[in-house]
Each structure stands twice: as structure tokens, then as C-alpha cells.
Amino acid sequence: KVHPLGFYSCTLLHENNQKIRLHYWDSITNGEQQSSELMIHDHIFDFKSWIMLGALENTEYEVSDEGELYYLYSTKYENDSSILKITEDSLKITHKNSSIYTQGMSYVMGANVLHKTRSLTDRAFTILHTQDMEYTSPRVLSNTNTSESEIIFHRKDVNEHELLKKLTTLVF
């Protein structure tokens, strides 16, 4: 499926509260991602990510009274869609740290850590192990107060031909 954050995601294993997923980051998203103003988010799961190809930059943020004001969206999932709903809440956040991870490296992140991740290369391939910690609504932040109270992103399936074409370009 195409993920709202601009990569392709394939769940290989789902057992109890854990998943193993493949993520493929491509320089050509064809507009198949949500607004760049909606990239800071957190998760309801802890995860470990292994970088198999390419490089990623992960930037973490923390809540701080001296930070920049961001508007808070809650996330819910219906069928194959992610639905962001603006809340009445806002947060002030500051940059905590940025880290670059390259092929052969791995990193871990806890649930509820505000962050954004981007590929630094034309293509990146990662394996992600997640473990659900709680079921609350994942948070998404925006520094722009949009007039849209609800934003819907359909996680469309990637057809087999398109996926095969992308995977045959990978060289390990």
C-alpha cells in the first residue's frame, strides 16, 4: 500500500501486537503523500528499523514552552483510509535531535515520540519491527492552521506490475 508519509508499505507478518513490515522509499511519489506540513507524527508502537538500502534522516521533537506552535490532529483508520481530524489542542515543540542512518544501520524509537523521517537517497529500503504499546490515537502535527477539519488519505494498493518494476531496480 502507499503510505500517507510517502513510502510503500507491505506487512509481512502480523501476530498479536507485533508486525514485520517492508518499507520502500522512492524519490517519485507522484503526489501520493499527505501535505509536507503534516509529516511530524508519533506512533502507538515501539519499533526497530533496519536500513537495507539507502539512507534516512530521522528528526525528533519535544514539547517545550519555548517551541513553535503546532496544531494537533488525531488519526483514525477506516478500511484503507487514514483520517486526520483537527482537535482543539495545540502543542509547542522544539527540535530535539536529527540522526542519519545508512545501509546496514538500525535504530529504535519508542511509542509517542514526535518525529519525522525522510529518505536522503532516491531509493531506500527498510525492514520495520513494531510492537503495539497502547491503542490511543496517533498524533499528527501541523504548523499551519488549515480550514479543513478532516483530511482523508486513501492507502491505495500498489499493483503487482508496478511493485515488481520498483523491486527489480533494487541492487543490494
Predicted regions span which residues?
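Short, conserved beta-strand element in jelly-roll/cupin
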Residues: 42-58, 62, 129
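Short acidic-glycine-tyrosine-enriched beta hairpin
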Residues: 62-111
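A short hydrophobic beta-strand segment most commonly corresponding to one strand
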Residues: 122-138
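A short, N-terminal "cap"/entry segment at the start of jelly-roll beta-barrel domains
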Residues: 1-26
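Conserved short histidine dyad/triad with adjacent acidic residue
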Residues: 22-42, 59-65, 111
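Short beta-strand His + acidic residue motifs that chelate non-heme Fe in jelly-roll/DSBH
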Residues: 58-59, 115-120
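Hydrophobic/aromatic beta-strand patches that form the interior of the parallel beta-sheet core
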Residues: 48, 107-108, 125-127
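Long hydrophobic alpha-helical segments typical of transmembrane helices together
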Residues: 141-172
